[in-house]
Amino acid sequence: MRHGYHNLTNYRMLHIAKDSPFFEEYAQAKNTESFSCEVPSDWACQLDSTWRYLFPAKVNLPDQGWKIHLSSCPTEAQLLLDVVGGFLVKKRVAFKHLVSYGSFLRLNGKNANRSSSGKFITIYPGSVGDFLALLEELEGLLGNFHGPYVLSDIRYKEAPVFFRYGGFRYLLEEDGKGVSRLAIRRPDGSLTEDQRKPFFVLPDFVSVPFGIKKQVDARINPSDEFELLFAPYSILESLHF
């Protein structure tokens, strides 16, 4: 079972080449410079054409929880990975990162799905306490780095550090029409969709930790000042996701 998982539609879109009607593993279709991150020999490594998954031995992750996304600009990406990778290895925290500059450019391109764009590194904390501690430490480490906003998430403070609640493992449910979709588990054990939208979605059964309550409240209940930014306009529809 893959530890991280994909939006199925996004996964297909990432494997269709320009001017081609066929899906193809991107790693086979085009060679691009790879990102590198050294980990100890007792870490597990899984690789696909977009992501490299890195997991320390004897660390059991929950199926879901609060996860952290880091964004970057192309010129800083390898340096950011060097800094964060070394930090997470010392902490023995599971994470994944984009495998190459090619995958980085595709996920940040204008045709990429907005719900996944901007994500360069995904971090899987083992507990809520670990999650809150990692947010604060990463904010200190990455204060001089730059990256785009991850639309599905909330920014923690000023650094390119973002978070959302969602699945850590590959769980699927059917939507009633026979279509499979990514899922998370409710407290009663039933599955519900893990909504990956180009905006933040808080599952209705999730309690918000005190350490991020201010940021979550500000996103869910925007101030009047924020609403005034859109006052002269009527939003009809999106041109593109």
Task: Please tell me what each predicted stretch does.
Residues 2-241:
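Phosphate/pyrophosphate-binding loops and the adjoining catalytic core of nucleotide-dependent enzymes
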